[in-house]
Regions:
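N-proximal low-complexity "stem/linker" segments adjacent to membrane-targeting elements
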Residues: 1-22
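Active-site regions of enzymes building and remodeling cell-envelope glycoconjugates
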Residues: 48-60, 137-141
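Short beta-strand-to-loop acidic/aromatic patch adjacent to the donor-nucleotide binding site
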Residues: 84-97
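Short beta-strand-to-loop element that shapes/binds the nucleotide-sugar donor at the catalytic cleft/hinge
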Residues: 119-135
Length: 143
């Protein structure tokens, strides 16, 4: 079985983060381990699923933004020697929306297995203007 490390970036939105984590736990718990990076969140705004709370003065003031927050989470997995446990990494923010009542991680894992040359999957809704940048002959999946 493939295993995915899911890293969720949060800042002061515990309710949204908890809902997102609980969705993944309900539908994809067998396929993923979930890690929550709290990027400068106030102590009273931590997700109940907080894995790492980055609360340096600079991060509390400015947050971490996506790249820095995800790199922080990935580095923690590397430092803890857990990197090799995973076949893939799923990097999301706490405002990510999933389709109701269905697997997310398993669906993405099946795409990766079916398409061995696939290296990165990035979200893009059918309703987003960014889909037009992908190009007609490019590989696209919508779920």
């Amino acid at each position: 079985m493939h295993k995915t490390a899911t890293i969720v970036l949060n800042r002061n939105l515990p309710k949204e983060t908890n809902i997102l984590v609980e969705h993944l736990m309900k539908f994809d718990d067998d396929y993923t381990d979930i890690f929550v990076v709290e990027a400068g969140s106030d102590k009273n705004n931590l997700s109940k699923y907080c894995t790492w709370h980055v609360n340096t003065k600079e991060v509390v003031k400015n947050g971490m933004r996506y790249s820095r927050g995800m790199n922080y989470g990935l580095l923690q997995l590397w430092k803890s020697k857990r990197w090799e446990e995973y076949d893939s990494f799923f990097l999301i923010t706490n405002d990510t929306k999933f389709p109701n009542n269905q697997h997310t991680i398993l669906t993405l894992q099946e795409l990766m297995i079916k398409n061995q040359r696939l290296g990165i999957i990035s979200p893009c809704s059918k309703n987003w203007g960014e889909k037009d940048l992908i190009g007609e002959n490019s590989l696209k999946y919508f779920w």
